[in-house]
């Protein structure tokens, strides 16, 4: 039987809020029944005799929470980066996602994705599948086995797709969604369903009404896209002339989040003042996707503004608009693009600090999953052990310096251990 209480000793780094990063060398972090019991300079007497894993000088940090990625697109990540969003969807993404009607192809592709995500810095994620029920259930089966905690959504789209990737009607789309929810109810320990209208241009009002009814019935969170690209925003305005901004296209159906059933909205590059106010009112989680926003020439989201407004905000890799599964890379990308926005767009919004971007990847995005993303007492014990011995330096570095260097210079090969809710993944 696995021990319900154990400790790991090493150099521990974690956020306490968006501005503060705690770093403790030679510290003990105690996990009890899957949650953090505390971080201590010495092991308290009450925990005397528990198993202790000593990782030496390696870094111990919270697991990363990826708020936005597309599993079927992993098959072409790192390719076709010379297109903007709408062209990229029609020429590359939709044809690839159509292949997942073939379960043998889906199994090959999703098996690669699931294993690579297991080996990555990500411990929790909110994932788009495709509109295919069977392939989505296959992805859920594979992700369950990884031990990672994920939300996975069967995509809904009944317009503006392609002949091979579009549901026949709102009735068919809603019916398939009910079948998927029924098939998977109570089946998983690690995987949960999330309603996934692809984005407003892909969903008729009839479908959005049906999804709103399902949301109320099943009490499910929602994930979608918001204000990613200027052409997309103009298209939404044409499709929904009764709305004054993109977010209202979701909110009019009750699909823009609530305190007990939050919504993740990816990108939010061009959100208006009114949209930001509604996002704050509804408790929307912004999934900032800096790499994708760069690759698809979408723009740079005003993340500093969202932090100042105290919006919920985390990071997303947005595979395959983003080319890397690494959430460490996403942290560095978020900092870098914020500097460009400050220099080129709006010098009133200062760049992100390391503390802020690290918080977004851990505690900020982790809040979507509950008490997740830090080593404060009572939070679920999701952890990474990072070995930076391959990065040589002529003099000793502080723990913060080592963490920053790993974020900028490492890849996932530096990860020597991974825990989710106290369970050791590797």
Write out the residue ranges for each language-model feature.
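N-terminal metal-binding scaffold of metallo-dependent hydrolase/deaminase domains
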Residues: 1-47
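Divalent metal-coordination and catalytic microenvironments
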Residues: 11, 29, 34, 57, ...
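C-terminal cap of metal-dependent C-N hydrolases
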Residues: 15-17, 380-426
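Alpha-helical scaffold segments that flank or form the walls of functional sites
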Residues: 30, 77-148, 173-187
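Active-site gating loops and adjacent loop-to-helix segments of metal-dependent hydrolytic enzymes
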Residues: 77-108, 159-171, 229-260, 333-352
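Metal-coordinating catalytic core of metallo-dependent amide/deamination hydrolases
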Residues: 139-269
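His/Asp/Glu-enriched, well-ordered alpha-helical/loop segment
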Residues: 245, 252-259, 304-392
């Amino acid at each position: 039987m696995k021990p319900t209480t154990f400790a790991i000793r090493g150099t521990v780094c974690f956020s306490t809020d968006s501005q503060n990063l705690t770093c403790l060398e030679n510290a003990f972090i105690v996990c009890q029944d899957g949650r953090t019991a505390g971080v201590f300079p010495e092991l308290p007497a009450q925990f005397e005799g528990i198993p202790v894993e000593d990782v030496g000088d390696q870094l111990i940090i919270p697991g990363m929470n990826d708020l936005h990625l597309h599993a079927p697109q992993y098959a072409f990540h790192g390719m076709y980066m010379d297109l903007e969003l709408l062209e990229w969807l029609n020429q590359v993404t939709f044809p690839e996602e159509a292949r997942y009607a073939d379960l043998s192809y889906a199994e090959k592709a999703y098996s690669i994705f699931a294993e690579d995500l297991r080996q990555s810095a990500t411990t929790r994620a909110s994932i788009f599948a495709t509109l295919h029920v069977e392939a989505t259930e296959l992805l859920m089966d594979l992700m369950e086995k990884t031990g990672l905690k994920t939300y996975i959504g069967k995509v809904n789209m009944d317009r503006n797709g392609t002949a091979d990737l579009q549901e026949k009607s709102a009735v068919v789309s809603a019916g398939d969604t009910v079948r998927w929810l029924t098939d998977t109810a109570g089946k998983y320990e690690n995987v949960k369903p999330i309603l996934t209208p692809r984005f407003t241009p892909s969903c008729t009002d009839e479908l959005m009404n049906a999804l709103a009814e399902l949301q109320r019935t099943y009490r499910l969170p929602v994930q979608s896209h918001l204000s990613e690209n200027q052409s997309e925003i103009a298209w939404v305005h044409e499709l929904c002339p009764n709305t004054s901004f993109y977010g209202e296209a979701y909110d009019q159906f009750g699909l823009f989040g609530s305190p007990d059933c939050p919504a993740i909205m990816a990108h939010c590059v061009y959100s208006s003042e009114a949209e930001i106010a509604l996002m704050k009112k509804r408790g929307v989680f912004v999934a900032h996707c800096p790499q994708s926003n760069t690759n698809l020439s979408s723009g740079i989201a005003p993340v500093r503004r969202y932090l100042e407004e105290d919006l919920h905000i985390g990071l997303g890799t947005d595979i395959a608009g983003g080319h890397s599964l690494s959430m460490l890379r996403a942290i560095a990308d978020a900092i870098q693009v914020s500097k460009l926005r400050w220099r080129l767009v709006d010098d009133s919004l200062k760049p992100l600090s390391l503390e802020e971007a690290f918080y977004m990847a851990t505690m900020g995005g982790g809040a979507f999953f509950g008490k997740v993303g830090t080593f404060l007492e009572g939070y679920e014990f999701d952890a990474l052990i990072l070995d930076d011995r391959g990065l040589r330096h002529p003099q000793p570095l502080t723990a913060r310096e080592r963490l920053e260097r790993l974020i900028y210079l490492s890849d996932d090969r530096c990860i020597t251990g991974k825990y989710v809710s106290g369970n050791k993944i590797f």
